[in-house]
Regions:
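Aromatic- and glycine-rich beta-strand/loop motifs that create alpha-glucan
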Residues: 1-28
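Residue-level recognition of transmembrane alpha-helices
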Residues: 27-31, 105-106, 184-185
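Generic transmembrane alpha-helix motif of multi-pass integral membrane proteins
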Residues: 14, 18, 92, 165-175, ...
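Transmembrane helix segments
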Residues: 38-41, 174-204
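Transmembrane helix boundary and interhelical loop/hinge segments in multi-pass membrane proteins
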Residues: 73-92
């Protein structure tokens, strides 16, 4: 079987494993939590905010906190599908290049993160619109720059590739959840507290 066909098969198998795990639940809950926060935060105030501020607030929460934590949990779940049943020996004995095993997992994780970004955009728009409908005084003002918002989320997604690579390597390297979770939580903490520092730009 040609290598492209083998990789497609490995990718399909990995996607099937994801559907049977909690990864899809995580992919739905993380963006939903941000949308719920945006919704109730808008209802809490008495003054309308521009669309740009509302959308940038959603993107900031996603980039600084929810995305790193989601990637940490997602990569741990993906790795646990093999670590749990101790299936690595069987997988590595299969007649296909080993890089297919790892690349298919990376592609699936990136695909889920991309889907989460799209879902975040949709839910944020619905949350802001719904808050304005329930409380007209806080209805977002100004132009709704959806293209700019999607571009921002796309740039955040591209910047997250390094984060995915690091977290997935750690999750695959160690059978325990602890190292991957420790690095993910620690990295998120330092990225948040070092936002205003010069070193903050070096933290994925």
């Amino acid at each position: 079987m040609p290598h492209p066909a083998r990789f497609t098969t490995a990718l399909a198998v990995e996607a099937h494993k994801l559907r049977r795990s909690l990864a899809l639940l995580l992919a739905a809950v993380a963006p939903l939590l941000i949308a719920v926060f945006v919704f109730f935060n808008l209802l809490r105030v008495d003054k309308a905010a521009p669309w740009a501020m509302t959308l940038q607030s959603s993107a900031a929460i996603w980039a600084f906190f929810m995305l790193p934590m989601s990637v940490t949990a997602l990569t741990a779940l993906v790795a646990h599908t093999e670590h749990g049943p101790r299936a690595w020996d069987h997988l590595r004995a299969l007649p296909l290049p080993r890089w297919h095993l790892y690349a298919s997992k990376a592609v699936c994780v990136l695909g889920v993160v991309a889907a989460m970004s799209v879902l975040l955009a949709l839910l944020t728009l619905l949350a802001a619109t719904g808050a304005g409908w329930l409380k007209p005084a806080v209805a977002a003002t100004g132009a709704m720059d959806i293209a700019g918002y999607l571009t921002l989320l796309g740039r955040i997604f591209l910047a997250a590739w390094l984060l995915v690579a690091v977290q997935l390597w750690i999750a695959l390297r160690y059978a325990s959840f602890v190292p991957a979770l420790a690095v993910g939580i620690g990295g998120t903490f330092f990225a948040v507290v070092a936002t205003s520092a010069k070193i903050g730009m070096l933290l994925p």
